[in-house]
Amino acid sequence: MLTVISPAKTLDYDTPPVTERFTLPQYLDDSQALIQQLRELSPAQISELMHLSDKLAGLNAARFGSWTPDFTPANAKQALLAFKGDVYTGLDAESLAEDDFSYAQDHLRMLSGLYGLLRPLDLMQPYRLEMGTKLANARGKDLYAFWGTRISEWLNEALAEQGDDVLLNLASNEYFSAVKRSALKARVINVDFKDLKNGQYKIISFYAKKARGMMSRFVIQQRISDPEQLKQFDVQGYYYSAEQSKPDHLVFLRDHPAD
């Protein structure tokens, strides 16, 4: 089983990585093509394109300018440790053991507007490029057109390497839309996390994002290989709802948020 999650806007390049192991991103030719195009934009154009403040637009213009195809631990960091935000708070990669990183490397992928698809230990230079960005390019009107069926094909390869065909989707709609289902040779398992609020179970963004990270960690630490085993997920008060679930759409409920 292969799990996919979204990246995060918030990055941490200050905290030293908890593992010295690293790999290199596999699709840097595509990343470099995007970087070359992004370098042609002024900070004001970046601000308009990405709906960023002037300060953040300037920061990312500088990031695009300093980006290099030569990745080292001095200018980059393992993706799973560089991303922060709600999903990654739930995943808490800093406390994973070395053998957990080994398992994650084979069974977890992060979708990315700039890098396409990242493995946990792939070095990543800092960037901001959300998948939904309407960046017209040589392949089409936006990043979905740029990546085309590539991400699906790479996921197919990763699944074939582990002799499986189950893809656990813990990514947002914005990012999973970059996976072309028609080109994907996999059974996709979707998951919803709902919290009780005002007498009804609802998807609350902050809690749902954190829960996606917690389930990713659960899969890694428990070495989950069968979707049926996902029903055992019971972290921080969540429990499986057979009534609300379908075979390929699992629903977990929580009556009292843990925080």
UniProtKB/Swiss-Prot annotation:
Q: Example GO biological process term? A: response to hydroperoxide
- Entry's Gene Ontology cellular component terms: cytosol
The record, for InterPro entries, names: YaaA (IPR005583)
* Organism superkingdom: Bacteria
Q: Report the sequence similarity comment from the record.
A: Belongs to the UPF0246 family.
Q: Which PANTHER family match?
A: PEROXIDE STRESS RESISTANCE PROTEIN YAAA, PEROXIDE STRESS RESPONSE PROTEIN YAAA
Record protein name field: UPF0246 protein PputGB1_4560
